[in-house]
């Protein structure tokens, strides 16, 4: 199954929606589904769907179909910030992610690291909507109000961790699948608490939106394992973020490149 074939498979399943248009981007291996009435839509990274298809077959296709249908259905509805304060969260995206909507409306965002940005989303249950300036102006909200509420809400999310050990290195995973696992990288208190558990160097990875990896690296093997693990998660994620990891030092995140047995370049 290649990207063109997956595009055709998804398109065939969604053809029952007469108002939707489809576009295949061979250069970026993506598919765009858009409602021509609203000019709003979603862009899918096809390699991630294909990787899941190799493991789950038709279940992977059904999952992406459900995601697209729910997302575009929600876009037809009017979403408001007022009254939904508890449903506003920050989301992490790569620096290649657009900073404005297809209509040219700026999305509310902040710099995070050299590899990542922070966007802000209104959770709508089965999907979410990224908050843009037009939405804020309409309700007379300012940027700081959105950010303050979002940061508070992400700190309120539970942070259950699963632990795995490889060659004396310890890896912790946050994987609740609530859509905001990667967002927990913004919970400074949680990161500081995890840092107290570390015996070696603390590293963090957010390969896609549904996982946060925290690593206690005690030898060179740990660096290699983290690099391979992060790349695998990145390739399989529905919303990929970055295949790079970060060192956590003095409350700061610094991207690291791991090549073979070398720790950083």
Swiss-Prot record:
Query: Which InterPro entries is this protein grouped with?
Result: DUF1444
Q: Which domain of life is it from?
A: Bacteria
Show the Pfam families listed in the entry: DUF1444
Q: Which family is annotated?
A: Belongs to the UPF0354 family.
The protein, known as: UPF0354 protein GTNG_2723
- Organism (species): Geobacillus thermodenitrificans (strain NG80-2)
